[in-house]
Design a protein with these regions (language model features):
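C-terminal motif of bacterial Sec signal peptides marking the signal peptidase cleavage site
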Residues: 17-18
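Bacterial Sec signal peptide processing site at the extreme N-terminus
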Residues: 21-33
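N-terminal capping segment at the start of a domain
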Residues: 31-71, 82, 295-312
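Second-shell loop/turn segments in exported
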Residues: 35-42, 57-66, 93-96, 139-150, ...
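A non-catalytic alpha/beta surface segment that caps or lines the substrate-entry region
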Residues: 60-113
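Solvent-exposed loop/turn segments at secondary-structure junctions
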Residues: 62-63, 92-95, 113-114, 124-128, ...
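Acidic/histidine-rich catalytic neighborhood of metal-dependent amide-processing enzymes
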Residues: 140-243, 268, 272
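Active-site-adjacent substrate-binding region
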Residues: 217, 224-333
Length: 333
């Protein structure tokens, strides 16, 4: 992902006129329905942490490497073991420098027959460049990508495990996007091209795993396991999936995770959610770490460095994100 230059977009206030109903019984029924809240399963942060560790144990999951191939097999088998119908999308994608990437999007579908669907996604690849590392000698080394990549996948694997045991009312699709982090490096002197990022999600949005695929909305998890992480409204999400953003952050407040989910806008980013929406036409919310006080990067001091390792993971952060997402999807009708 990449921070985008600030864009200010005015919002148009829309007036909504509600039709009255003289029936007291109808009004009472509606009021009762609004109060019903489904108790979601308990998200296990230890389990999510273990799935993150398992990915890290393969090493950097950079496309065209053995670690990448081995981890892809692991992820597909995990989803299958959790009862999902698994789809594999293999594609040759062209990187910014002309490298052909042997990419693989991995999709796990629950209740594939249901027309009511929610999309949950994260990227599973590691960045091939530690181009934000304070040591220039590391700039062309592969990063481990524990928070940036593995954390979102780990949370979704734990959600998949829970969905196998207790399915929500709607169909769930979990997608692990590939080749998200192969964008133009900081040391490149040529013209910047936004679409060199998020290659896997661009491919999926153009050629979804199911013809005519559509979901009510999506939730993207990116860098969701760091110590002291905070998640602000991501501006693109807040413009294009505003009601979903409000719903997720409100749920986090209700669950006691307001110190993680900050009800303010952060920085706009280029991430998979942009292409899920612009190409796939599905509104998608990016839950992504944002630290306005961090000097090296608002994504955190170890973003795109050799220090994106397990030492930075916090089970409390994983719990806050995972439980919030689960409570949201289990209360969909």
């Amino acid at each position: 992902m990449k921070i985008k230059d600030l864009i200010i977009v005015p919002f148009l206030a829309l007036g909504i006129v509600a039709c009255g109903n003289s029936s007291k019984q109808s009004n009472n029924t509606q009021a009762t329905e609004k109060k019903v809240t489904v108790k979601a399963p308990v998200f296990n942060a230890d389990s999510a942490y273990a799935y993150i560790q398992a990915q890290a144990d393969f090493g950097p999951r950079v496309p065209n490497t053995q670690a990448h191939r081995d981890c892809g097999e692991y992820l597909a088998k995990q989803l299958e073991s959790f009862g999902a119908k698994v789809y594999n999308q293999y594609a040759d994608l062209t990187a910014w420098d002309g490298t052909i990437l042997k990419a693989r999007n991995i999709i796990g579908a629950y209740k594939p027959e249901s027309k009511k669907r929610i999309l949950l996604c994260a990227h599973w690849d590691s960045r091939p460049y530690a181009d934000n590392d304070p040591n220039p000698k590391n700039h062309q080394k592969h990063i481990l990508g524990v928070n940036d990549g593995a954390s979102g996948v780990g949370v979704l694997l734990e959600i998949a495990r829970q969905v196998k045991q207790q399915e929500p009312n709607v169909g769930i699709d979990i997608i692990f996007f590939d080749a998200e982090d192969y964008g133009i490096p900081e040391f490149y002197q040529g013209a910047y091209k936004q679409d060199t990022w998020c290659l896997g999600s661009q491919y999926w949005a153009r050629t979804p795993h199911v013809q005519g695929y559509f979901a009510r909305y999506g939730i993207l998890l990116d860098m969701v396991g760091g110590k002291g992480a905070t998640f602000f409204y991501e501006p693109y999400s807040n413009r294009t999936a505003r009601s979903e953003v409000k719903k997720i952050w409100k749920k986090a407040q209700e669950l006691g995770y307001g110190n993680y989910f900050v009800q303010q806008e952060g920085a706009e980013v280029i991430d998979d959610h942009v292409y899920v929406h612009t190409i796939g036409r599905i509104p998608c919310v990016d839950i992504i770490n944002y630290d306005p006080t961090c000097e090296p990067s608002s994504f955190g001091s170890y973003w795109h460095t050799m220090n994106d390792t397990m030492e930075n993971m916090d089970r409390n952060t994983l719990k806050a994100v995972g439980q919030t997402v689960m409570d949201v999807i289990y209360n969909e009708k």
